[in-house]
């Protein structure tokens, strides 16, 4: 018998998200390596114990794209945390079943390097390929349960995006 999980009893996982833009204002989008269907997203991940959100953002950027902090310029930070809930079919199956979704702080960075410096084949590889895309295409490409988050993030950083 499968046990039913009440999402209201679970906390949100503290995370960061990174909107990485190039000189034209296009957004870095990575194709998730663990998805059987096209699932594009921006770099994101958990905040480690004792880590500040901005530190976590730069660490996640490095782990997922191979881009070091010296090759990006801080542009902005979203004023509010945003949350999303996992859909029922994923609840209890990811993150050891400990979380109902994520609570994210988003950061906007401008990439100062060249495309050939991006290295997604890192020790913590999350993406099978990547590309630069416009804001509307990024929102359309994300999995549906994260779409409201991406809409809010894009609206927040709109003045800087292509």
From Swiss-Prot:
Biological function: Accelerates the degradation of transcripts by removing pyrophosphate from the 5'-end of triphosphorylated RNA, leading to a more labile monophosphorylated state that can stimulate subsequent ribonuclease cleavage.
Organism: Cereibacter sphaeroides (strain ATCC 17029 / ATH 2.4.9)
Protein name: RNA pyrophosphohydrolase
Enzyme class: hydrolase
Gene Ontology molecular function, alphabetical: bis(5'-adenosyl)-pentaphosphatase activity; guanosine-3',5'-bis(diphosphate) 3'-diphosphatase activity
Lineage top rank: taxon: Bacteria
Intrachain disulfide bonds: none
Swiss-Prot/TrEMBL keywords: Hydrolase
Residue span of motif Nudix box: 45-66
